[in-house]
Amino acid sequence: MPKWLLARPGPLAHCDDMRLTVVELDPAMTATARRWFALQDDPRLTVRHEDARAFLNRQKEQYDLVFVDVFNSHYAVPFQMGTREAAAALRRAVAPGGVLLMNVISAVEGEDGRLFQSIYNALRSAFAHVRVYCVGGTARPRDVGNLMLAAFAEEPDGAAEAAWEKSASPALLALLRTRYRGRLDFATLPLTDDFAPVERYALMLLRQ
């Protein structure tokens, strides 16, 4: 992701005043990215090797975009990143007018959607507006797939969005068309730091 954002013709290639901070727990992953995936040094890029939640808990700076892509296994989000308290910490990290993107592998509805539903409800408790995009091509709400949650610090301006979409690239427009338009009212409780059975929810998915 950092390489794509910063390298030509990436979206930030010509934005010299942009700054990108990556929080990665394992230094070996960064070394692998440099050795095998052509991640280059860039004065706009800062890499922090620490737990993402620990970083958030002490972070004072705010960001226009926060992207969360963390997994313990094929499906399980580390519990400390999917709770109501984590959502509040993420909200504090998002600047006014900014957005959080979070990658989750799950169904939307049914037993296989419990992980997504709990994280969705946690984000709804902290952000003004949350949308869901079925970016993995999920055909039906009960199918397991790649979901992208977009949580907005403020209610989106519909007129501004419509104007912005007129100049969006075809690839981005295709992504926006994957927005889930079904029911997003779930009884599943948000996870908390004291009760976060993410492994149990993930085991439901592993039986697929």
Language model segments and positions:
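Alpha-helical scaffold elements adjacent to nucleotide-binding pockets in ATP/GTP-utilizing enzyme cores
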Residues: S118-A122, L147
